[in-house]
Amino acid sequence: MAESKRIKTALVSVYHKDGLDEIITKLHAEGVEFLSTGGTRQFIESLGYPCKAVEDLTTYPSILGGRVKTLHPKVFGGILCRRDLEGDLQQIAQYEIPEIDLVIVDLYPFEDTVASGADAQAIIEKIDIGGISLIRAAAKNFNDVVIVASKAQYKPFADILNENGAVTTLAERRWFAKEAFAVSSHYDSAIFGYFDGEEGSAFRCAVEDQKTLRYGENPHQRGYFYGDLNKVFDQIHGKVISYNNLLDINAAIDLIDEFSETTFAILKHNNACGLASRETVLEAWKAALAGDPVSAFGGVLVTNAPIDRATAEEINGLFFEVIIAPDYDVDALQILTQKKNRIILVRKATEMPRKQFRSLLNGVLVQDKDTRIETREDLKQVSEKAPSEAEIDDMLFANKIVKNSKSNAIVLAKGKQLVASGVGQTSRVDALKQAIEKAKSFGFDLNGAVMASDAFFPFPDCVEIADKEGIKAVIQPGGSVKDELTFQYCNEHGVAMVVTGVRHFKH
């Protein structure tokens, strides 16, 4: 089997023509003959190069409104013929089938059509049949055939042409085959995802959209992102986003999406260390920073309101890795972009996936995303004392934060400001003690604050500790076999408590 192969005949059938002209020009200069259909053939001929119609080869026209163009033995025989098998060569000679050494395909834009909001019929018509078949056939026979399966591979193929002419090595053909199967598997999983709809049982890894990160969680680990970040945000300034940046950005977006009021949050290691809701974005920033000005250093900032100049001036004095906002004033950007490595993101109004995936052991865990947001109607008063209106507002506020904190988690809030939190603790009591200690270290008065827990209290101990600090309103899921002991403590000590019936573990 010859390692190097010269391309003599190319079949070209693409949806997107941009970037193709350089390749066609170079192939023509190398003496390569072209086969094509419809618009692609017209494109090649418009460049001034001859191109044989597939219909002339097969003696069949394009039928069924273009649904069947290349699906014919004279096409696929020329692609799948094994050049080192005499029997294959004899058969294609018998049936006058030309050898095809190169296949260039760019599939119908199925995902773009779905995203455009097109109707079902238009979406179905963008399910490519001939193109995907050509990709699989050419990739299967990579020993003899080169497959360029998407416009993303135009450049690497053009580089080979510029360096070696119309000659490819086995290693190069195998690489293109690998990329081709990545394209076909992603395409098929996208179609499955469309038909699967809200069931969300499709696990898709967008190999063709692989992004190499600086490193993984630590410098000695390699890291990659599979997917399309451009659908979530635009990066308008700063260094390359890292693995850890993405974890924090994801946590920040999940958290800020809980709030409709103007809100600012500061996160470190996926947990909020500062958060507040206020009338203006500047006021929200100041209150969020006051929650923990020490941990804010090197954090990720996120808000659901546009950043103005005054807010940018305040923010600029702090070192932080990333800022996410729906928009920025021109003056604000002039200030924020003074630090060249600072990552500035513009959040897009994109609906986030409804499923979450986590790889472990020898497989993948899949679950529905926790999109539940409790409201006043979900609160059940279990204490004799009723919470005030302000306490209810603060309890719902704190509940949103604790839901997005690592378990075990306790959140203390007051006046729609995160006062302190204890997160990621093996003991709920330790989480509360951590929060109390932090609040005191920054001078907060806990009298009138509320407490939120991500899961039930197995004993009254947390409520007792909080009560002694002046915390007289508590929100929790409830559900412990010893709930009544906790409720009894509340009644004996004038603590208002509501339960939601919904646990919010986060691991």
Each PLM stretch: what is its role?
Residues 152-160, 165-328, 332-335, 339-369, ...:
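Active-site loops and adjacent core secondary-structure elements that bind or stabilize anionic groups
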Residues 301-302, 308-317, 442-483:
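Cysteine/selenocysteine-centered motifs that mediate thiol-based redox chemistry or coordinate metal-sulfur cofactors
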